[in-house]
Amino acid sequence: MHDYEPDREDGLCSIRKMLKEAKGIGDFLGEMRDRTFKKYDAFSVGEVFDEKDEEIPDFIGDNGYFSSMFDFEETIWGASDKGWYDCKQITPDAYKKCCFTTQRKIGDIGFVSNIIENHDEPRGVSRYIPEGDCCDASKKMLGGLNFMLRGLPFIYQGQELGMENVKFESIDQVDDISSLDEYKVALEAGCTPEEALKAVSRFSRDNARTPMQWTDGENAGFTTGKPWLKVNANYTKINAESQMNDPESVRSFYKKLIALRKNPEYKETVVYGELEPVWEDVHNLMAYYRKGDKTLLVVGNYQKEPQTCLLYTSPSPRDPKT
């Protein structure tokens, strides 16, 4: 038993400190693997936090507990023990660093599962694209940068449409218990109701749980009844029906990414190839090579103004020359 020191003004301590010292988790996960997934050669992916670098082979190595594990490096960036109201908004440079940190850490141990969002996170385009720059072009850029990373790309419902965070007008429109708790924490810390709601709106997982935007009809075509969460007001502009036959839509771009990954001509490079970061010090730019039997260069410019970078040429994909 441990009696942990309080880490907040309410006299309580985050459970994460206890989790970091938990023992015997590997024994349980190994038994679960052997008695369930392994017997059927089933694919499994774990939500893993606080793992040590030397433990990664245990989780996703040749005989790992799971087939893969999600990359949460960018989702926990800027977190604060004080609460959401004190969390930092991630920048393009920080996002780039998080992605490359994971890529270097995992290496060829196994395949990490790359995400922009999921059911427990806000919408990725609202989180990782700078405020005021969220548009179809930037949504495609973010999707491409994430999808082309080494690993297994996961697409959460609505991500392929570029669905965005909802604008909550009142805390009464929020359902998630953690969001309601964080609203109280912000108020107790001295935030105004408006400031507390803004913090909750930015990070609430209810953003990813609003009704799927199928059409521009009633309740976004999700239901003829009353949905339990507010429908995002932008459903008339962002919905599946309007993007189905639009070759320039966000959805069409994701289809192209999927087709590229499945293309036998590029599979060896896109799926199994190495990842080599490039121009890491260039502000508002994320770029990397994928190297296999071919060499592909993936570049995303976060700013409206063009940038100039020195391009490498190489007679061999694995031996770049200036």
Model regions and ranges:
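Active-site and adjacent substrate-binding regions of carbohydrate-active enzymes
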Residues: M1-L310, S314, R318
